[in-house]
Regions:
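Conserved N-terminal phosphate-binding loop of PLP-dependent enzymes in the Aspartate aminotransferase
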Residues: 1-217
Length: 217
């Protein structure tokens, strides 16, 4: 099998090349290799569509979901077609792998969250909000920005400066942190429900935080 994130999260929001993804899918099909797509962080509208794979013109054999799936409660999912799931019912039966699987309260929360997402215009508004961030979230100390939908990383000259910026952001009311494999970048991932007014206020606070961090560096 091949396991991929179409948008690598912890490297600092790194989207895969569409042609490469299509070629990967074709190669997997030609070799009868299962393609597993991890959308635990990118799923449920974060990238501008319900799932990121929709923007790449492919359908994975297996889809991994979590985080936003539960609407605030712990919930994960392994999604595949009937044939694929049927292969997991014997030799051996995989029903023993979870104690709390299918928790009814978490599943109800996930279902309710999905209904709210589908009934709102949040996903349709992401392109406008993404463009606003690209136009307004600019500062000389930001060396690079990588983004996909309402999801962005800001790169600074060092991990020390990035962590100072993150700390100043938190002090100014903006929750952020750095990335597991990119400590010189900070994460911009506001809730999909954020209004343009709130987004504008957040951008201003981030700029102020950068100024404060640079001054103390």
């Amino acid at each position: 099998c091949v396991l991929v994130e179409l948008v690598q999260a912890e490297t600092g929001i790194t989207p895969a090349n569409k042609d490469w993804v299509i070629a990967l899918k074709e190669k997997c099909e030609s070799l009868c290799v299962v393609l597993i797509v991890d959308e635990i962080q990118s799923g449920f509208g974060r990238t501008g569509t319900l799932f990121a794979f929709e923007q790449y013109g492919i359908t994975p054999d297996i889809l991994l979901l979590g985080k936003a799936l539960g609407g605030g409660l712990p919930l994960g999912a392994f999604v595949a077609n009937t044939k694929m799931m049927g292969a997991l019912t014997h030799s051996p039966v995989l029903g023993h792998i979870t104690t709390f699987g299918g928790n009814p309260v978490c599943c109800a929360a996930g279902n309710a969250a999905l209904q709210v997402l589908q009934q709102s215009n949040w996903i349709h508004e992401i392109a406008v909000k993404e463009q606003f961030l690209l136009e307004q979230l600019v500062h000389p100390s930001i060396l690079n920005r990588s983004h996909k939908g309402l999801w962005m990383s800001l790169q600074f000259s060092s991990s020390v400066l990035a962590k100072k910026v993150a700390a100043c952001c938190v002090a100014n009311g903006i929750i952020t942190d750095w990335f597991l494999f990119a400590e010189d970048k900070i994460r911009i991932a506001p809730p999909l429900s954020i209004t343009m007014e709130e987004l504008s206020e957040a951008v201003n606070k981030i700029k102020v935080s950068i100024e404060e961090a640079v001054a103390s560096n």
